[in-house]
């Protein structure tokens, strides 16, 4: 028995509601789907993007932010999105280095995309990811759990608060909940 296999990439808004879906009969992975299907469509359809003048006036302002899981981790891709489109990327750090001292973490109020405010122990640093050619500086935010585990996220949303980044990435679970109850 042979069946056609496809991969669906769901693009959701900040509240986890579906914006659109890309079906790929031949799939070469998330990064290729982002480059060829998702980003071109977002550039056309995302409302309220900054003007060219606004982007020129503020070197840290992004056109919009895309958030994805570890499969999309690629310093070269982050650099490409920022250089070519001024799109910021937020994802989990696939290769975090050693744990940070617990003294760097502070109890922080994080507003999730649905408006819920949660208390999290967070710390932030600038970090270099990738190699000399394709690497770049990113904002790294870590969440400290009660067990001492550190969850690391990285962001090229340079002009935003780390708390916003943390809330956005941690809210990504609303997508999984959407599919669970769909």
Residue ranges and their predicted role:
Residues 20, 79, 83-178:
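An anionic, glycine-rich sequence signature occurring as long contiguous blocks
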Residues 67-75, 95-98:
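Acidic, metal-coordinating catalytic cores used for nucleic-acid/nucleotide bond scission
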Residues 26-29, 71-75, 160:
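Short acidic, S/G/P-rich loop/turn micro-motifs used as interaction or catalytic elements
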